[in-house]
Amino acid sequence: MKVDFDSLNNIFFVGIKGSGVCSLACFLNSKGYFVEGVDVPDKFYTDDILNNNEISYYENIYEFSLKELDRSFDLIVYSSAYDKDGLQVLLEAKELNIPILSYSEVLGELSRKHYSIGIAGSHGKTTTTAFLGILFDKLGLNPNVIVGSSVKDFGDNSAIAGISDIFIVETCEYKKHFLYFSPNMLILTNVDYEHVDFFKNYEALEDAFLQYINNLKKNGILIINSDDKNLLKIKSQINREDINIFSFGSRDLSNFQISNIVVKNEYFCFSFLGLYNIELRTVLFHNILNFSAALLALNLFLESNGKSIFDFEEVVKRVAKNYSGIKRRSELIKEKKGVIYMDDYAHHPREIRATLFGIKNFYKNKRIILDFMPHTFTRTKEFFDDFVEVLNIADVLILHNIYLSNRENFNPDELSFKLFLNIKKINKNTYFFKDVKDSINFIKSLLISGDLFITMGAGNNFILHDFL
């Protein structure tokens, strides 16, 4: 279904607390549309984003009726986390002939109207999108940006509503949602087997990425991370002569190599694209790759418009050095009584490994206390042995019951406790609390000066920081 956004006034979002849906709601709100929504009463970090944008929302999604609204709406946008045919509000909208689009369909519609840059990958797409949005914004290019988290450089917002034709968007591979998007430029950060409830094997996931590459507009630009062997395999299967492919990475397999990588205090320093001694404020090596992907995209865009990245060298280096992070990505929450408190969204074994090793390497003398909440039954079951291995990197581990997605109806108790028992055999400093809040007093008794406490996962254990 195609929608003329110029003719719309009021847009209602079903599942408005989802990271991407929230960002889209904020984006369209900033564009002048009247926006409201509905979701569950559970607290998410997106509550703060919506409240800061003065977007009102209901919290009774399973009982909600359009009759509760005091105005009519021109469009209903829904999150794929919910069954389109299972919610009363969507069934009512269908009966009333109100246009209904998924979040991904709306992004697709918008992408066809702009010079669109899509960022995709199993890991790092949120950070890369944020980096690219910050760079374009600080260079005065007035971009439109939608990213799946709160970005401090956006004023703790998750979207920028610019006045240019540039549309920078984080796009997701789950259920092939990114196939709605039609980019002029596409950045691929990496590919890892994930979303096992939908992709029955790695080959199915790989095929989805190849399909996405085929969505590139004619003479489009593809940027890939050549440090990722799976992306190199995908690159070898591309059968389009009308697109331009560029690679970057820390090895000499790439067209554009990152070099001179050293750690200096809280910065990673490196050289890229002829810019020397870039100081990136981060504790994680993979953020060098994410920033370099964004920098390469910016450079290619500038060159196509008769400019050079060297014209903006001072601004680029300032962005890197002053980078203040994004919500739930190795986020420093606070320091209190000698304890560092952090939060991270990592929920796949590869992400967990990279984040924990990065933190251990940076904070060499800290005891790492990890509070982890597994996310989705299917992911935990599929990567069970990998979770056992990577969660042992922490010095002390606190586990909780699996946080199920809205699409799952499994009982998580048995698998959650099995994960705990298997890790406990290897690391005796492993503890289990089915409910997050039941662990508060234990954690308080555990922490001493010199510790680093980090909550991790795509569940809701981040709420612990409100009590510690």
UniProtKB/Swiss-Prot annotation:
Binding of ATP, residues: 121-127
Q: What does this protein do?
A: Cell wall formation.
* Major localization class: cytoplasm
One example of the protein's molecular function in GO is: UDP-N-acetylmuramate-L-alanine ligase activity
The name under which this protein is listed is UDP-N-acetylmuramate--L-alanine ligase
Tell me which EC number(s) this protein carries: 6.3.2.8
Q: Does the keyword Cell wall biogenesis/degradation apply?
A: yes
Which InterPro entries does UniProt cross-reference here? Mur-like_cat_sf, Mur_ligase_C, Mur_ligase_C_dom_sf, Mur_ligase_cen, Mur_ligase_N, MurCDEF_pg_biosynth, UDP-N-AcMur_Ala_ligase_MurC
Organism the protein comes from = Borrelia garinii subsp. bavariensis (strain ATCC BAA-2496 / DSM 23469 / PBi) (Borreliella bavariensis)
The main enzyme category here is: ligase
